[in-house]
Amino acid sequence: MKRKNIALIPAAGIGARFGADKPKQYVEIGSKTVLEHTIGIFERHEAVDLTVVVVSPEDTFADKVQTAFPQVRVWKNGGQTRAETVRNGVAKLLETGLAAETDNILVHDAARCCLPSEALTRLIEQAGNAAEGGILAIPVADTLKCADGGNISATVERTSLWQAQTPQLFRAGLLHRALAAENLDGITDEASAVEKLGIRPLLVQGDARNLKLTQPQDAYIVRLLLDAV
């Protein structure tokens, strides 16, 4: 039986660092919100079977997304943290039968709206049949420094360092088990939760264009990337 690929987009955050008057996933770039650009990536990809967006129960912007993408599931069961939001989304996928434990869940940041389709294809092809799952990532290019107050305390050896991106692809059952802990402190992405089970996910070559909209100045770069598509 074919294993499904389900995109899960946690979009319950408020994006405080971005400094807008609304969550950054609802900031408009061009004629669409950031979240709409992100959803479109998965809806256009032939290997993705379903897209699910998990928002906050108090979300007042999601109706526009549902109108733009009536086939996408928009669930208002987000948690206080990203990990809780993903956990709630995966649990509902399993409870409703929309996902089997062996199906692939591709968790993707709502604010990464420039993911190239070829990077998504590469992740599915290389990690889609891997029991340990895998993530998009790129080797660290810059020299990294440790800080002590306002001074450099050490230079970090970067040879084996990779910068994690999304999507992060794992079987639904594995992801559900990895996020089942009552205390999810320190879990900043899905791979870190899976690693706590003693599993070593694959690193799949990502793409520098797959940046995360975090600071206000990032919007300029994102706009250029979207215009180039």
UniProtKB/Swiss-Prot annotation:
It is an enzyme of class 2 (transferase). Keywords: Isoprene biosynthesis, Nucleotidyltransferase, Transferase. It catalyses: 2-C-methyl-D-erythritol 4-phosphate + CTP + H(+) = 4-CDP-2-C-methyl-D-erythritol + diphosphate. Its EC number is 2.7.7.60. Pfam families: IspD. GO terms for biological process: isopentenyl diphosphate biosynthetic process, methylerythritol 4-phosphate pathway. It comes from the Bacteria. The record marks 158, 212 as: Positions MEP for the nucleophilic attack. Catalyzes the formation of 4-diphosphocytidyl-2-C-methyl-D-erythritol from CTP and 2-C-methyl-D-erythritol 4-phosphate (MEP). HAMAP family: IspD (MF_00108). This is 2-C-methyl-D-erythritol 4-phosphate cytidylyltransferase. It comes from Neisseria meningitidis serogroup A / serotype 4A (strain DSM 15465 / Z2491). The gene is ispD.
